[in-house]
Amino acid sequence: MAHIPQIKVPATYLRGGTSKGVFFRLQDLPEAARQPGAARDALLMRVIGSPDPYGKQIDGMGGATSSTSKTVIVAKSSRPDHDVDYLFGQVSIDKAFVDWSGNCGNLSAAVGPFAIAGGLVDPARVPKDGTAIVRIWQANIGKTIIAHVPITNGEVQETGDFELDGVTFPAAEVQLEFMDPAAEEEGAGGSMFPTGNLVDDLDVPGVGTLKATMINAGIPTIFVEADAIGYTGTELQDAINGDAKALAMFETIRAHGALRMGLIKSLDEIATRQHTPKVAFVAKPVDYVASSGKPVAAGDVDLLVRALSMGKLHHAMMGTAAVAIGTAAAIPGTLVNLAAGGGERQAVRFGHPSGTLRVGAQATQEGGEWVVTKAIMSRSARVLMEGWVRVPGDAF
């Protein structure tokens, strides 16, 4: 039996926010994987180590969590007023598919630094010292992200004193602006609130009728009230991720919310759409202790939010869900806004399992409709390893 040798693919392993993933320049991918399709998906799954029935991704670069089973492809952009196109693939851990239905807000922070270092940004746009403005086209959802990347001596500055709850070590701050984050793309309901309401009654079999804010901003997200499903909003991962009944409940909420939002046509479609929508629960502030042991006082935050990603409670907060939180908080009457105390607000600081995060959004009413021009938050990013990733030559 002939054994196919491994091939080497240029790649960079980066942390972005509270996630990490394998980044590729489109031009560096094997020719068969330069276009969307089965070959690309198979390559990325093999790189990450999926599908893995053991759920560990031992034979790949993945870390067996939703935050670490991620891939990114970046290319020079042909679009006016954009520097690069950014495509994100969320790799299923134990099933054979890559979910292309949404963005990763955390890894968005690493796209600008990767693009600059990889020669994908016009050198004339990169100062010797200061801040480079990288204009990113987020190809999954058809939106613009503006990244403010610190530059020292002509190179991306990665070290610094910016601290991010959920990340152990400080690093340089990368500010992100998510422009016009509400949905307009086909299949997303065509608006920020696909049902037309700030709050809906969502009928969930086995759970009952829940008040829900279903919003598409940053990423489609279903917000429910913590106390309506038996929680306080102070839960850490262990309280939910080991509870099969709770996880099944959240997946049922997610499926029925997706149907109401027009993201799926039948409930059975949700099984292969793990990345979107997200489901989250909100509560008014109370004291709690974060997963690091750090106390979070009720007075330190405007509200509490817990969110699930890929079927598990997230260890911190997905960046795109933070955009949804900031956007919903800015619009009076949503469940997120009410949990934060109601009224008009341009920014909120919310408590999550790892600590706190501040996110802002600019919202205005036009013709009776709420419009959000942008959401803003800060993350950090750092190269962890660069070189080549190896995969068997017959893997795709």
Residue ranges: model-predicted function:
Residues 1-396:
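A glycine-rich beta-to-alpha transition motif near the start of alpha/beta enzyme domains, typified by
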